[in-house]
């Protein structure tokens, strides 16, 4: 029921706009002015749905579409629905907007922004590495070596034991106690 009413309402609007437009094409200026006023409301709603994230562009695009309708009015075929013709023009204007924005964003996207991102990440990593090395340097070898081999170099407990000449148990205990000592040192520094 509601769908039928909506379709009837749409058809009535279509017929009204078409009548105003055809009368305007015949030289009736008042009908043409009314047509442009009503069409602008229709276009505004049509474009607002499609430009949810760019609401500031809606009014400009409405004006561009109205101008295009006016300039291309001689191409309208009265045997065809007016709404399809107007929507095609509005869609072309919408595509033009997206192209303009893409070109603008492409031209104005600086390469330096990407470099700053990586350089700051590198600088932060270097600072963290320096701070960690400073903290580890204060630990005795039986704590420092197990942490460096297992946590920083990614060796297994067995591999760390082989490299350092310590037992596997000593590696596990050294890591545990070394991390505990580092945590206490960091807490004391704060």
Curated annotation (Swiss-Prot):
Keywords: Cytoplasm, DNA-binding, Sigma factor, Stress response, Transcription, Transcription regulation
Cell compartment(s), UniProt: Cytoplasm
Record feature DNA-binding region, as residue ranges: 157-176
One Gene Ontology MF term: DNA binding
Effect of gene knockout: Growth inhibited by 100 uM chlorite during aerobic log-phase growth, no expression of the SigF regulon (Dsui_0156 to Dsui_0159). Growth of a double sigF-yedY2 mutant is completely inhibited by 20 mM chlorite.
Motif Polymerase core binding, residue range(s) on this chain: 60-73
A GO term from the CC aspect: cytoplasm
GO biological process, one term: DNA-templated transcription initiation
InterPro entries reported in the protein's UniProt record: RNA_pol_sigma-70-like, RNA_pol_sigma-70_dom, RNA_pol_sigma70_r2, RNA_pol_sigma70_r4_t2, RNA_pol_sigma_r2, RNA_pol_sigma_r3/r4-like, WH-like_DNA-bd_sf
A Pfam family: Sigma70_r4_2
Major location category of this protein: cytoplasm
Induction of its expression: Part of the SigF regulon, induced by chlorite under auto-control. Part of the probable sigF-nrsF operon.
Start and end residues of each stretch annotated as Sigma-70 factor domain-2: 34-102
Superkingdom field: Bacteria
Start and end residues of each stretch annotated as Sigma-70 factor domain-4: 130-182
Family indicated by similarity: Belongs to the sigma-70 factor family. ECF subfamily.
Record NCBIfam families: PRK12536.1 (NF009188), PRK12539.1 (NF009191), sigma70-ECF (TIGR02937)
Function: Sigma factors are initiation factors that promote the attachment of RNA polymerase to specific initiation sites and are then released. Extracytoplasmic function (ECF) sigma factors are held in an inactive form by a cognate anti-sigma factor (NrsF in this case) until they are released. Regulates expression of only a few genes (Dsui_0154 to Dsui_0159) in response to (hypo)chlorite, conferring resistance to reactive chlorine species (RCS) during oxic growth.
Self-association and partners: Interacts transiently with the RNA polymerase catalytic core formed by RpoA, RpoB, RpoC and RpoZ (2 alpha, 1 beta, 1 beta' and 1 omega subunit) to form the RNA polymerase holoenzyme that can initiate transcription.
Protein name: ECF RNA polymerase sigma factor SigF
Record organism: Azospira oryzae (strain ATCC BAA-33 / DSM 13638 / PS)
């Amino acid at each position: 029921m509601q769908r039928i009413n909506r379709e009837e309402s749409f058809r009535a609007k279509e017929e009204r706009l078409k009548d105003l437009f055809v009368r305007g094409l015949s030289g009736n200026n008042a009908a043409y002015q009314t047509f442009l006023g009503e069409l602008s409301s229709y276009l505004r709603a049509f474009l607002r749905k499609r430009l949810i994230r760019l609401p500031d562009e809606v009014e400009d695009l409405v004006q561009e579409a109205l101008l295009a309708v006016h300039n291309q009015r001689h191409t309208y075929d009265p045997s065809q629905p007016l709404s399809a013709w107007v929507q095609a023009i509005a869609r072309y204007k919408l595509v033009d907007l997206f192209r303009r924005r893409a070109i603008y964003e492409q031209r104005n996207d600086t390469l330096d922004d990407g470099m700053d991102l990586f350089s700051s990440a590198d600088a932060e990593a270097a600072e963290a590495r320096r701070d960690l090395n400073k903290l580890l340097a204060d630990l005795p070898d039986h704590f420092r070596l197990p942490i460096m081999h297992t946590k920083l170099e990614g060796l297994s407990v067995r591999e760390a034991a082989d490299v350092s000449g310590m037992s596997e148990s000593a590696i596990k205990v050294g890591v545990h106690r070394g991390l505990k000592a580092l945590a206490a040192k960091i807490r004391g520094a704060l």
